[in-house]
Design a protein with these regions (language model features):
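Short beta-strand/turn micro-motifs composed of small residues
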Residues: 13, 54-55, 111, 142
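Short, structured coil segments at secondary-structure junctions
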Residues: 46, 66-68, 156
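Conserved core of the sugar-phosphate nucleotidyltransferase
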Residues: 87, 91, 115-169
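Conserved acidic residues
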Residues: 7, 48, 69, 105, ...
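Short phosphate-binding loop-to-helix
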Residues: 51, 58-108, 124-127
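N-terminal glycine-rich phosphate-binding loop and ensuing alpha1 helix
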Residues: 3-53
């Protein structure tokens, strides 16, 4: 913990990918895609709990084999194309509060489809936000843009929207 902070990592991994079915369990350089995010989270010195939230038993089994905590299978209504990450996070936090009487000071969202983190990325981000928590309530990592504009997002006010709405479908 950083200064007695409880920190939760949430790795959301839906089973019903339309673009690449089963992508979270597909091998990438010798391990399932989801395994990369779990392994990086385990290298953090600050994360108290590494939770995988999924609607898919195969993903849950793989996540547990990598050492993640998977105490529930995500409800179907939170595993659709229209489900928001925000709602998935709220569900996970409600689970901990209601079932385990546990609350967290910070949540780290680790998308399994962004596996190329450096070993210390998570801890550096946590150190930064904890040191400046009176100024910021969230932090996000960014990198050089290599994606097509149709899948890019931009900040608008306190939300995110498609960079090119006319291309997003």
């Amino acid at each position: 913990m950083i200064r007695d902070k409880n920190i939760l990592a949430i790795i959301p991994a839906r089973g019903g990918s339309k673009g690449l079915p089963g992508k979270n369990t597909l091998p990438m350089c010798g391990k399932p895609l989801i395994g990369w995010s779990i392994d990086k989270a385990k290298k953090s010195t600050y994360l108290d709990t590494i939770l995988v939230t999924t609607d898919d038993q195969k993903i849950a089994d793989i996540a547990q084999s990598f050492g993640a905590y998977v105490p529930f299978i995500r409800p179907a209504e939170l595993a659709t194309d229209q489900s928001s990450t925000y709602d998935v996070i709220r569900h996970a936090l409600s689970y901990f509060k209601d079932t385990e009487s546990k609350e967290f000071d910070f949540v780290v969202l680790l998308e399994p489809t962004s596996p190329l983190r450096e070993d210390d990325d998570i801890d550096k981000m946590l150190e930064l936000i904890v040191a400046r928590e009176d100024e910021f309530d969230s932090i996000v990592s960014i990198g050089e843009v290599t994606e097509h504009p149709s899948i890019m997002k931009r900040l608008v006010g306190d939300g995110i929207e498609p960079f090119c709405p006319e291309l997003a479908q």
